[in-house]
């Protein structure tokens, strides 16, 4: 059984990072809680959305698929390895990952309607 503990983040794809940052940080006053450049000019920025949740914006495109992470939600799970095993045992295709980053682990699947659903686990120091 997958143990979901919170909504980890929601993702919005942006085409102009500077314009998006001006809007989210300047206009809306959101505070940056993570700012990572995956590759030159390819950004993943998370804004504090209260509690363990964040709003992520990105212009990142996967080098394997030339597609950006699609808008979607990420579920924070307390049992990441078990969640990954449960998804695989159910025959659900992993569409992104599994990935290990400095602050977290994450993978994605498609729901029955083709929406991206991410499973996420923050590392203890995060």
Task: Identify what each model region corresponds to.
Residues 1, 61-64:
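Short, flexible, solvent-exposed loop/turn segments with mixed acidic/basic and small polar residues
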Residues 1-3, 6-15, 33, 45-48, 63-126:
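Vicinal oxygen chelate
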Residues 2-5, 11-53:
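Core segments of cupin and vicinal oxygen chelate
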Residues 37-39, 63-65, 99-101:
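A short beta-turn/loop motif at secondary-structure boundaries
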Residues 52-56, 113-116:
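Short, charged/polar, Gly/Pro-enriched secondary-structure boundary elements
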Residues 55, 66, 70, 119-125:
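Membrane-topology and secretion signals of cell-surface/extracellular proteins
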């Amino acid at each position: 059984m997958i143990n979901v503990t919170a909504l980890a983040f929601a993702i919005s794809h942006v085409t102009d990072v500077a314009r998006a940052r001006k809007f989210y940080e300047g206009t809306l006053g959101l505070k940056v809680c993570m700012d990572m450049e995956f590759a030159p000019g390819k950004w993943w920025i998370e804004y504090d959305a209260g509690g363990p949740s964040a709003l992520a914006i990105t212009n990142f495109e996967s080098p394997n698929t030339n597609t950006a992470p699609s808008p979607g939600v990420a579920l924070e799970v307390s049992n990441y390895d078990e969640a990954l095993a449960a998804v695989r045992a159910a025959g659900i295709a992993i569409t992104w990952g599994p990935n290990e980053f400095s602050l977290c682990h994450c993978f994605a699947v498609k729901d029955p309607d083709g929406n991206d659903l991410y499973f996420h686990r923050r590392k203890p120091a995060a």
